[in-house]
């Protein structure tokens, strides 16, 4: 345990403070400038609080480069600098209800009366400033070091939640948080891991890394969102409280987090904290605490700020939800693109409301950095409240005979040599006949966003492949009822149901087939753009790299991947076989040249889908809504116009009812779609 500062000499304190500054500044550089932290927040906070303690006891030790005097990071090369006329400050932190009570007591003693507080969720993202002149968006910037940030205007203009024009012609500088929703983060990491690229540690890093992309097309693809919560200068607004300011923001067209609450007592504040500490895993985005702000705006102005933090607000940081467990094994598995991924197998533990027994170790570089070994006691947490991740190893409990993990040199599925492709951190099997890759490819082909063959999952596909009934996707369409009845747990009715689902998938539009084929870098959105442009698979197969790259500024990486895929003789044979079994290879959706239906009732509406839909898939419903001019949102807020609720709808439906938002059941939505088709 560290010595108490009041028992130390100045020299001892100076030595420790210097070491802490060096360590903390290096961690800050990794966090802010590289978007790649190498230490848990709780460890950083512990070191930071120790430095604060030393500097408070020995004020002469405070230096201009101390992390206690700095805000954010440096300005990254490649972006123009933006000077914030009014600095973008960070927040002070507390870690216990007792510390929070002390902050409130000091504030109220200072002003001489009790204060109402606005409680807001602390979004785990990247601070953002948006500048509007006469109601028009003219600039977006990062916080940077608080005084000078990065001009990311081109990137933020691709984010759907940021209005290009306000509902009033105000000249304002609005601050908020840019974040990546949990679902978008999980999908992005899945794509990166499949492509052999380094994964992001958490949604905050993913959002920061995305906003700092020099190619704004990448930003557009990654589904970032924002919540705005503050303003540089209160004057342009009519609001007199923090809570009313958020409502005014929403009226201006900004996305705000609707889950704020005005607290009239500390009992209200603590109740809010307890509620969202429990609800945290259920939210669609990551939070790492609660922000408590004095609600009256005139009081905020009179209290002002220190060089680093406002005096009228504080962040209550949630304690890390970590559990120790035993690492029993490491399994190496092969994905559909050939990437070989290590997975830690552990004693099951309860973490953030779920039982966790497995965690990805991503790639050999990650394994080496963590130095995990069989038999280790490890600390497990959920990165961004989503993905189980080993945060550290308890070296004191490491068995004496524990050995470093052996990185495989041959494929665990087919035995082919593993390779490192250029610019990849992943190990990859490049044998196209690898059984694991073939099976994973079949699973992907049948998945909901691809050919949507209901009932054809990994268990049945494994049996079909093992029994040599299917060796490629075309073989699915040659299956017979007699063959299906030879499989385990397949009876007469389920065989007929599966054959019906397979038969129905023959009529899917071309974009589903393209996505289902598993072409590298071709996700569902890219597949739709390509299908819209070319119309038929024959036209696509004859297209040049330049033609494909020019589609909606798609670029060379995707175009090269598509061209290389269709250069294969085996792929040509597969396409002919699919056509021979009557699988559709033409595009059947709305034309790329036809604008969204501006005359539709849905035009301009913000719609949320929730619950289980029986008549159609969620992607199909989303595509239909978008084609009719709607914006499909991931969460319910005061700005939501309509919620379409299937069966087993949960918190989104409840929130819609609380906010008095129009709710349709699936039957009404289906009827609307049918009427539109007949019109």
From Swiss-Prot:
SUPFAM superfamilies: BRCT domain, DNA ligase/mRNA capping enzyme, catalytic domain, Nucleic acid-binding proteins, RuvA domain 2-like. GO terms for molecular function: DNA ligase (NAD+) activity; metal ion binding. One of its GO terms (cellular component) is cytosol. InterPro entries: BRCT_dom, BRCT_dom_sf, DisA/LigA_HHH, DNA_ligase, DNA_ligase_AS, DNA_ligase_CS, DNAligase_adenylation, DNAligase_N. NAD(+) binds at residues 41-45, 90-91, 120, 143, 177, 293, 317. PROSITE patterns: BRCT (PS50172), DNA_LIGASE_N1 (PS01055), DNA_LIGASE_N2 (PS01056). Pfam families: BRCT, DNA_ligase_aden, DNA_ligase_OB, DNA_ligase_ZBD, HHH_2. The keyword DNA repair applies. It comes from the Bacteria. PANTHER family: CHROMOSOME TRANSMISSION FIDELITY FACTOR 18 (PTHR23389), DNA LIGASE (PTHR23389:SF9). HAMAP family: DNA_ligase_A. DNA ligase that catalyzes the formation of phosphodiester linkages between 5'-phosphoryl and 3'-hydroxyl groups in double-stranded DNA using NAD as a coenzyme and as the energy source for the reaction. It is essential for DNA replication and repair of damaged DNA. This is DNA ligase.
């Amino acid at each position: 345990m560290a010595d108490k500062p009041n028992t130390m000499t100045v020299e001892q304190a100076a030595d420790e403070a210097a070491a802490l500054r060096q360590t903390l500044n290096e961690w800050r550089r990794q966090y802010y400038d590289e978007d790649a932290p190498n230490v848990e927040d709780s460890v950083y906070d512990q070191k930071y609080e120790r430095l604060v303690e030393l500097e408070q006891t020995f004020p002469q030790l405070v230096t201009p480069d101390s992390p206690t005097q700095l805000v954010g990071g440096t300005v990254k090369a490649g972006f123009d600098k933006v000077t914030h006329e009014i600095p973008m400050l960070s927040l002070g932190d507390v870690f216990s209800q007792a510390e929070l009570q002390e902050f409130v007591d000091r504030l109220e003693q200072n002003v001489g009366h009790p204060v109402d507080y606005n409680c807001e969720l602390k979004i785990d993202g990247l601070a953002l400033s948006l500048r509007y002149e006469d109601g028009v968006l003219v600039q977006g910037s990062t916080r940077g070091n608080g005084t000078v940030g990065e001009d990311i205007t081109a990137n933020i203009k691709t984010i759907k939640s940021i209005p290009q024009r306000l509902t009033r012609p105000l000249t304002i500088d609005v601050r908020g948080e840019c974040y990546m929703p949990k679902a978008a983060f999980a999908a992005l990491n899945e794509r990166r891991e499949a492509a052999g690229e380094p994964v992001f540690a958490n949604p905050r890093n993913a959002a920061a890394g995305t906003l700092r992309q020099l190619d704004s097309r990448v930003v557009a693809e990654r589904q970032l969102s924002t919540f705005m919560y503050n303003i540089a200068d209160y004057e342009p607004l009519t609001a007199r409280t923090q809570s009313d300011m958020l409502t005014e923001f929403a009226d201006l067209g900004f996305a705000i987090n609707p889950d704020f609450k005005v607290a009239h007592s500390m009992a209200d504040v603590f109740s809010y904290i307890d509620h969202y500490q429990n609800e945290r895993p259920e939210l669609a985005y990551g939070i790492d605490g609660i922000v408590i702000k004095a609600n009256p705006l005139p009081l905020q102005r009179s209290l002002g700020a220190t060089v680093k933090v406002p005096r009228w607000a504080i962040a209550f940081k949630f304690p890390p939800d970590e559990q120790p467990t035993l690492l029993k094994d490491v399994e190496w598995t092969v994905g559909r693109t050939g990437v070989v991924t290590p997975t830690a197998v552990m004693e099951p533990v309860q973490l953030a409301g779920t039982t966790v027994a497995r965690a990805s170790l991503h790639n050999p570089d990650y394994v080496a950095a963590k130095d995990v070994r069989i038999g280790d006691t490890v600390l497990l947490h959920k990165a961004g409240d989503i993905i189980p991740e080993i945060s550290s190893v308890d070296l004191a409990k490491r068995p004496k005979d524990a050995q470093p993990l052996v990185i495989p040199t041959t494929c665990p599925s087919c035995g082919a040599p593993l390779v490192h492709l250029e610019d990849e951190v992943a190990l990859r099997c490049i044998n196209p006949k690898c059984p694991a890759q073939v099976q994973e490819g079949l699973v992907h082909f049948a998945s909901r966003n691809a050919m949507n063959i209901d009932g054809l999952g990994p268990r049945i596909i494994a049996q079909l492949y093992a029994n040599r009934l299917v060796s490629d996707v075309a073989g699915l369409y040659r299956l017979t009822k007699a063959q299906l009845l030879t499989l385990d747990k397949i009876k007469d009715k389920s065989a007929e149901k599966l054959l019906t689902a397979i038969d129905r998938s023959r009529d899917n539009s071309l974009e589903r087939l393209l996505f289902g084929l598993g072409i590298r870098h071709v996700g569902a959105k890219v597949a739709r753009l390509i299908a819209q442009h070319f119309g038929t698979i024959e036209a696509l197969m004859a297209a040049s790299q330049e033609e494909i790259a020019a589609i909606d500024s798609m670029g060379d990486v995707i175009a090269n991947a598509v061209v290389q895929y269709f250069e294969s003789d085996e792929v040509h044979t597969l396409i002919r076989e699919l056509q021979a079994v009557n699988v559709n290879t033409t595009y059947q959706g709305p034309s790329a040249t036809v604008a969204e239906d501006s005359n539709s009732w849905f035009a301009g509406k913000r719609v949320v889908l929730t619950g289980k839909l029986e008549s159609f898939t969620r992607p199909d419903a989303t595509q239909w809504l978008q084609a009719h001019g709607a914006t499909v949102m991931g969460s319910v807020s005061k700005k939501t116009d309509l919620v379409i609720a299937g069966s087993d709808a949960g918190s989104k439906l409840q929130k819609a009812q609380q906010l008095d938002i129009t709710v349709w059941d699936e039957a009404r939505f289906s009827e609307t779609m049918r009427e539109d088709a007949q019109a």
